[in-house]
Amino acid sequence: MAHPHLLAERISRLSSSLEKGLYERSHAIRLCLLAALSGESVFLLGPPGIAKSLIARRLKFAFQNARAFEYLMTRFSTPEEVFGPLSIQALKDEGRYERLTSGYLPEAEIVFLDEIWKAGPAILNTLLTAINERQFRNGALVEKIPMRLLVAASNELPEADSSLEALYDRMLIRLWLDKVQDKANFRSMLTSQQDENDNPVPASLQITDEEYERWQKEIGEITLPDHVFELIFMLRQQLDKLPDAPYVSDRRWKKAIRLLQASAFFSGRSAVAPVDLILLKDCLWYDAQSLNLIQQQIDVLMTGHAWQQQGMLTRLGAIVQRHLQLQQQQSDKTALTVIRLGGIFSRRQQYQLPVNVTASTLTLLLQKPLKLHDMEVVHISFERSALEQWLSKGGEIRGKLNGIGFAQKLNLEVDSAQHLVVRDVSLQGSTLALPGSSAEGLPGEIKQQLEELESDWRKQHALFSEQQKCLFIPGDWLGRIEASLQDVGAQIRQAQQC
């Protein structure tokens, strides 16, 4: 086979050629190309006149010798119009029931069926066999059909609990298309003089029959690593828990895995990577509601688990808690002592913060943990300005418990030693202390754990950087993943500077 990276570059150039003159249809072209390269079916949902049929016609040019068939379904469509007319001569001379399939679906590599849900039962039943088994029963013969890509289109979804459900389930990739939105793209589309039926693909990029057949075998050799399977299973389990999640058949999961293998193969990789799982957003939805739900769940998977983001944050939280415990052991030496002011003519004693306390946000440690607002609290973050106002004028004081969430109302007082004391609902108190001096540096135990965590983060970020070169994944998804990893890295570095 060709070098994996050369193959990935070729497929990228092929896709770019197919996309010429089609505005805001890059993702649709790329996924239809991936479907064609892996022998799958695509459903395009959208209003009339948005280039659904043109997308299918373009895909024919990806192959050197591909034949195309397209048909607009109506309630009156007959099997003869899709699968070919009966041979009168064969019926008359030999009594054989045989169709003349030349120029019809049974002999086409690329098939486009518009308004698919208007097809009658006779067409649908034959079409199901064609999709499932790549076979067509022509009289007494069962003929193998060469179909590589079926693109079905409609401006509506099939009715629930209808006879169309079986066919809809066979359409692995489902894309929701709309009109051209961007102003510049709309202008370019209006003024374009390109003939939409011209072949935009250089012959050197077109795929031969031999290459296509060889690639089908090689796609099946792409491995599914354990950690990627665990992500898929996590997604499946999460969907099973949600009451509004769509039903996803085992058959659809199975076919989706082959699509992920194809994505990895044509991206120059020997194994499915977490980034390939983003394709599931176009495979698992059923209707508008489930489309949003699936995207949300995959977003959580990609930005929280696929590169161990949440796991690393959990580890970081444990390290920070341990660091605070070590600091609490030194807190008696660092208890915050406020300065008492004169207040001769004041009804309330006034205080101020020591001059060496200058941070805009103060993190104060509890000498012993307390349960505040149903949370085990070991430290509280105060806005300096709010704390100064409370010391001077009294009133309400709020702070963030363990430094997270919204600031909560606190029962805070100054004791006789001029220390700040926070109390729980049972009036048990805990003195607040400043963290240990930064000059002391991080304890060796904490420093080592943070260095190990940073090393793991670098490995995960490097893995993502290697895997993100995937033609079939939209750039905005890659941007969100990168942002999630950078956020984890920033929190680790911040902890190292404490």
UniProtKB/Swiss-Prot annotation:
Pfam families: AAA_lid_8, ATPase_RavA_C, bpMoxR, LARA_dom
The keyword GTP-binding is annotated on this UniProt entry: no
CDD domains: AAA
InterPro entries according to UniProt: AAA+_ATPase, ATPase_RavA, ATPase_RavA_C, MoxR, P-loop_NTPase, RavA-like_AAA_lid, RavA_ATPases, RavA_LARA_dom
Keywords: ATP-binding, Chaperone, Cytoplasm, Hydrolase, Nucleotide-binding
One Gene Ontology term of the molecular function aspect: ATP binding
Catalyzed reactions: ATP + H2O = ADP + phosphate + H(+)
Chief place of localization: cytoplasm
Domain of life: Bacteria
Enzyme's top EC category: hydrolase
Keyword Kinase: no
Positions bound to ADP: Y23, G49, I50, A51, K52, S53, L54, E196
GO CC list: cytoplasm
EC numbers, comma separated: 3.6.1.-
Location in or out of the cell: Cytoplasm
Family under the similarity heading: Belongs to the RavA family.
Chain's role: Component of the RavA-ViaA chaperone complex, which may act on the membrane to optimize the function of some of the respiratory chains. RavA functions as an ATPase.
Subunit relationships: Homohexamer. Interacts with ViaA.
Stated name of the protein: Regulatory ATPase RavA
Gene it is expressed from: ravA
